[in-house]
Each structure stands twice: as C-alpha cells, then as structure tokens.
Amino acid sequence: MARARPRLVPHGSGARDVRSRRRQLLPGFFGAVAESYLSYDETYAADEAASAAVWAPPGAEDDEELPTVLGEVVEEYAERLFEILGLMEAKHPVEPLYYLFLLGTRPGWQGRGLGSSLMAPVLETCDRDRVPAYLEATSERNRQLYIRHGFDVTDEITQPGGPTMWPMWRSPRLI
C-alpha cells in the first residue's frame, strides 16, 4: 500500500532517495490510519491486502490522537502532513456523509477492479440509506475512477510542492 499513494514526501531532486524515504514512512502512516479507522467497521481489504479502502461513516468522531501518532510516524515530514491535512479539512463538508479517507491498490494489482469492489458495499449503503459520500482524489487516474462511480469534482486543492487533489462529492443514487 505504501507504493499506492506516494504523495507525502515532496517531489524534488534525488528521486531515488525520495522513493526510498516514501517506502520507509508510508507503511507506518497507512498502519496508523487503518488502526484509527478500524473502530468504524468500514475498513475493507482485498486479495491479501493488495487493495484497501478506509471509510468513516456519518457521525464518526475524529480520533484526537491520530495527528500526534502520524506526526511521529512521518518524522521530518510532519509539518508537510499537517499542512496537507489542514487544506483537506478546510474543504471537508460538514453534513453527515461517508468519507473515503483512503483507497489504494498496489501498483502490480491496479486495473483489476479491486478498488471498485472495495467501494461498492459502502456506495450501496449510501444509495440505500440516502447518504452522500465524499473523498479527495489524489491523482488524475483516481479522479477518473471516482467519476465512473458517480462522484463529481467540487473543488481543487493545490499542495505546496506537490500534486493537486480534487475534493469529490457523490449524491446517493436512486435505487
């Protein structure tokens, strides 16, 4: 999973060193996020963790310890992490919704429908219960995947020294 979403460590010179550092930091990052979100019972994995989806249901309370844990995990990139999380929080809707914090698939497993299969149960619940869903797409490829599942881009977040993210909203579909 650490190779599925390498956005925390900024792009720049020394590409090999940057990739190496990402591989060191991101497993701890994803582990801390998954552990924090497990209590919501909306965390899914497929094919021996080749793909995972981490959702928060409507009314989920923030884990107040998670930022501290993540700051310790990402070490010298904590300031950047908090900057990114602040940008995300500023765009986050306030109404009750399902929030997809993380969807990732290992590169060798991408394009097989694993991510779609992991979104399906929650999106079906959204439709049945008439609850919207929200996420931030972190790449053009992911943005296109989410559009295929009924999400619409609502804004744009430009990360300092990094790629653009797109907040996306999905209204419940009639069933």
Regions found by a protein language model. Give the residues of each.
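N-terminal secretory/targeting leader peptides
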Residues: 1-3, 101, 121, 143-148, ...
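Active-site rim helix/loop that mediates acceptor-substrate recognition in acyltransferases
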Residues: 19-42
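Conserved acetyl-CoA-binding loop-helix of GNAT-fold acetyltransferases
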Residues: 105, 111-124, 148
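Conserved active-site alpha-helix within GNAT-family acetyltransferase domains
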Residues: 116, 128-130, 139-156, 160
